[in-house]
Amino acid sequence: MADLDDIKEGKDFGIDRPQQNTLYTLKGCGSLDWGMQSRLARIFNPHSNRTVMLAFDHGYFQGPTTGLERIDLSIAPLFADTDVLMCTRGVLRSQVPAATNKPVVLRASGGNSILSELSNECVAVAMEDALRLNVCAVAAQVYIGSEYEHQSINNIIKLVDAGNRYGMPVLAVTGVGKEMTRDARYFSLASRIAAEMGAQFVKTYFVEEGFEKVTASCPVPIVIAGGKKLPEHEALEMCWRAIDQGASGVDMGRNIFQSSAPRAMLKAVKKVVHENLNAREAYQFWQEEKQGELK
């Protein structure tokens, strides 16, 4: 029996209006498949096209480093305040409740330690397991200028090929070769190579001079590494300068979980990244939040 809806007149087909197609505006990602864009849209805030990632994957080569002795005590209280979690699959399965419902960037390279050559890494996670864990991206180091440069680039290529097959973005993390200087020229080289190999976004270090050239010459989003622990005002200054010079976010670990007020620091970093607070304003915000956190 025909439904009345089939013969009813007066439907609005919008014949006078062309269909609107919403473009995905994240840098360099407009032509990616839907699944890839969907995962990236969970990592990068669709309104700001920026992200704040909480890195606590250090144990994959450093073991129980300061601040990460007990993930459940030091990191779990920060889950609610970050945009993204960056960790290993071991910690994800054992320490992160599925109900946390935060996008995850999964550490997918390893096979080394602080006692050996750091650049000697392999792909340490099968793409099928990353999919099983429902993560939003996988991450691997790329060591340009190191003894194992070719191997690290090949790791990125393998992950990119598998990621393209399944709609999984790849984050390339620029490690520093022993013979290379930490300057804009080196990080421009490393970041560009990672992007050319197909990484959908790149994590690199902020440099005092020429960082705007690093971001400008990389065709995909760059997030900065937090690096070693700095005084809070210096870390916030670094965040602000990086965002001002074209970074699409930060991936911070030690400058968050080793802070005297970690949750306040994480909130202050988000203020810089998403609300464009300058370093002075963010530091004042941190001081105010710190009082409440330490009560």
From Swiss-Prot:
The active site is at K203. It holds the Pfam family DeoC. It catalyses: dihydroxyacetone phosphate + acetyl-CoA = 3-hydroxy-2,4-dioxopentyl phosphate + CoA. GO terms for molecular function: acyltransferase activity, transferring groups other than amino-acyl groups; fructose-bisphosphate aldolase activity. InterPro entries: Aldolase_TIM (IPR013785), DeoC/FbaB/LacD_aldolase (IPR002915), DeoC/FbaB_aldolase (IPR050456), FbaB-like (IPR041720), LsrF (IPR033673). Homodecamer. Belongs to the DeoC/FbaB aldolase family. NCBIfam families: PRK08227.1 (NF006081). SMART domains: DeoC. Its EC number is 2.3.1.245. Involved in the degradation of phospho-AI-2, thereby terminating induction of the lsr operon and closing the AI-2 signaling cycle. Catalyzes the transfer of an acetyl moiety from 3-hydroxy-5-phosphonooxypentane-2,4-dione to CoA to form glycerone phosphate and acetyl-CoA. This is 3-hydroxy-5-phosphonooxypentane-2,4-dione thiolase.
